[in-house]
Amino acid sequence: MRKRRRQPSLAQLRAFAAVAEHLHFRDAAAAIGMSQPALSGAVSALEESLGVTLLERTTRKVLLSPAGERLAARAKSVLAEVGALVEEADALQAPFTGVLRLGVIPTVAPYVLPTVLRLVHDRYPRLDLQVHEEQTASLLDGLTGGRLDLLLLAVPLGVPGVVELPLFDEDFVLVTPLEHGLGGREGIPRKALRELNLLLLDEGHCLRDQALDICREAGSAGVAATTTAAGLSTLVQLVAGGLGVTLLPHTAVQVETTRSGRLLTGRFADPAPGRRIALAMRTGAARAAEYEELAAALREAMRDLPVRIVRD
């Protein structure tokens, strides 16, 4: 007779999914708020329950076994479905209550989050908003995998199973050192970008990709930047130090340029290069009506920002 296996617990699946994502016990434990011994024990218990080896452990690294490779996606799917179940139950209780896990890209978070947080505090006091700042690829993985509920980021995404709720459009502004010839000018033609030493964010930031697209549209063969930065604050200081120029979203200009007296901003001729910011949710999300209402409220709250509100 075939031995009856014990059913794996959600904690075991969550531990395995975290290790499969990070391939590192310490990072995986930190990601889900579990101690390393507890994480290791949960994965071992899952292996015993399933009767297969999921991980190949060495003194230097952790790898997924062939069985682990196959079952990691299934574990992620199960956790996403459980998350959707809890989400739907929360939505049935009362709108705008319970936990809302919001993912935000780094080039939006410092400049737009204050408006979001004020709105939630004033209008939705029973909503437990949890903010996660990550790059776009990580946010999308979190949304589709059920780790996050809603995203605030640049679009279009073009991702199946993800619905975009546009909020606003904003222009990019050229930031230069004081002595630069384009500093403070209005009506700068895009073709001027062909001759500029444009400083960019590191790989993985969507703002970097947008800047490269703008350069290509202007007729530049591409930017071979030898200097990059992990954040806009560092990027602006590099400009102030005379290493080049950069593009900033208009919402970031006041925060990032007032710290240095050695910067000027220039505006592009219409139509200026820019980006669209939106909320993004899973197709068929149980709380879709709430998210749409939140998007409408955010559009009204963001009228004082230097942006153009997108009416749904």
Swiss-Prot record:
Tell whether Acyltransferase is among the UniProt keywords: no
**CDD domains reported for this sequence:** PBP2_OxyR
Q: Which residues bind DNA?
A: 25-44
Signal peptide, first to last residue: none
Could you tell me which residue ranges the HTH lysR-type domain spans?
8-65
UniProt record similarity statement: Belongs to the LysR transcriptional regulatory family.
Can you tell which superkingdom this protein's organism belongs to?
Bacteria
- Biological role stated in the UniProt entry: Required for the induction of a regulon of hydrogen peroxide inducible genes such as catalase and glutathione-reductase.
What this protein is called in its record is Probable hydrogen peroxide-inducible genes activator
Keyword Transcription regulation listed: yes
